[in-house]
Amino acid sequence: MMLVLCLAALCAVIAGCQEEAASPKAKDVKATPEKEPAAAVKPAPAPAEKPAAAVAGPILGPFKLAKNWADEQGFVVNWLICGVFPNPGERPDNTGFGTDYLKNYGGEAAFTPTNGTEIKKDDGSVVKFLPYSTTGTDIIFGDVAHLKIESNQEKILCYCACWLDSDADKDVEVRVGSDDGYKLWINHQLISEMHVYRAMEMDQETHKVKLNKGKNLLLIKVDQDTGEYQFMLRVVGSDGKEIPGITVWN
């Protein structure tokens, strides 16, 4: 009897061991938290394209400064002229004078044109800097064919540009007469701002400037309210005489 009981106990122990081996106790495993999905990365917006001035050709020259009489010398009569642009409002508040119509091309102070540079206006139309020269001393805008100015057209403005090519550094006087007002830049520096309404006379303003050796960019913006529309500009010494060694390119 004792032998039977011992055999039964032994069988129970063996069976328990087999059950434990078949079903091992699971270990405690820490749950790994799910990672939040990464936020979608939005591509950086492409920088707005800055309109580039379309260049159709090189500048022309050199040309001599013009002379009318012995005491009327040094006139710049070869220009690149672009227009017309609007100059709305009533004097003395015509707003075109203070509007930078070259803002999409670097701005008036930084702008550099060449023969054929295109400017897209706010209304979508395109105007160009094109060469013009006169056999006189005055730039009369109504005579500039490519501007297509209608008879007695009012409240407009134009830009004119040229290069003064100097054979050395020189102190000069740039003398301006205008109908009506103007802004003048030389080598991208604002030299004068005359928001006036007047008839033109020679040498209404005298600006003492220093030309560098080589080409010096001159840009002038001339506005019109009513009546005649013109300007004259000459480059002379303090005695009003032409200075040798200066030519003009446009």
Language-model features: where?
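Aromatic-lined ligand-binding clefts that engage carbohydrates, nucleic acids, or primary amines
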Residues: S166, D171-W185, L218
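Accessory carbohydrate-binding/adhesion or oligomerization-edge regions at the termini
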Residues: K27-D138, I220-N250
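A general sequence property marking short-to-moderate contiguous segments
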Residues: P131-N152
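Extracellular beta-rich ligand/substrate-recognition surface
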Residues: L147-C158, H195-M200
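Bacterial N-terminal signal peptides
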Residues: L3-V13
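Beta-strand-rich ligand-recognition modules
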Residues: I186-L233
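Extracellular and analogous surface-interaction loops
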Residues: C160-V172, K208-K213
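Bacterial lipoprotein signal-peptidase II cleavage site
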Residues: C17-K27
